[in-house]
């Protein structure tokens, strides 16, 4: 029987689990929240954080999976690509490409290096880094979280004094 590992256990995984079962596929859900709804419908559950790619890889190898995916669960996409590449499984793309596409800063850098027009943007790890670049931008600006899963945390900043607020 084929085995599919689904990263994440939220309700969004339910249609995938149902479709896999209809095809006779054994489904393993994986995340660190044992009460997530999808685990009740999968055949097996792994209590592992989906962003810990090495632990997910270890579990995937031990379970001898035939496929891995992260459906409607952005944090697991990079891990799914990593595991698929390490195990020679089909995937949406190479690990390096997926890493670029899942990180806004890396994606903008890729676009710029390849001649695409992109808005002026910078990536910062903390408030003090952002404050060093206040002269680079024309105010007001838009602040957004780097992780695609947090994209709804966009904020309009009218002046540089609001940077600490935006970085919360």
What role is predicted for each listed range?
Residues 102-168:
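Active-site nucleotide/adenylate-binding loops and adjacent lid/helix of ATP-dependent enzymes
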Residues 1-97, 128:
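ATP-binding N-terminal substructure of ATP-dependent carboxylate-amine bond-forming enzymes
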């Amino acid at each position: 029987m084929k085995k599919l590992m689904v990263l994440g256990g939220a309700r969004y995984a339910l249609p995938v689990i149902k479709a896999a079962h209809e095809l006779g596929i054994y489904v393993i859900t994986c995340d660190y929240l044992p009460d997530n709804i999808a685990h009740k419908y999968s055949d097996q559950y792994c209590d592992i954080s989906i962003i810990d790619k090495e632990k997910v890889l270890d579990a995937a190898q031990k379970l001898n999976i035939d496929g891995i995916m992260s459906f409607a669960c952005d944090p697991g996409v990079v891990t799914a690509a990593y595991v698929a590449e390490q195990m020679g499984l089909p995937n949406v793309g190479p690990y390096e490409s997926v890493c670029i596409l899942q990180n806004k800063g890396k994606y903008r850098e890729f676009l710029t290096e390849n001649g695409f027009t992109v808005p002026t943007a910078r990536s910062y790890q903390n408030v003090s880094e952002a404050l060093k670049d206040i002269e680079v931008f024309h105010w007001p600006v838009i602040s957004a979280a780097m992780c695609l899963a947090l994209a709804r945390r966009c904020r309009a900043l009218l002046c540089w004094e609001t940077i600490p607020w935006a970085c919360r």
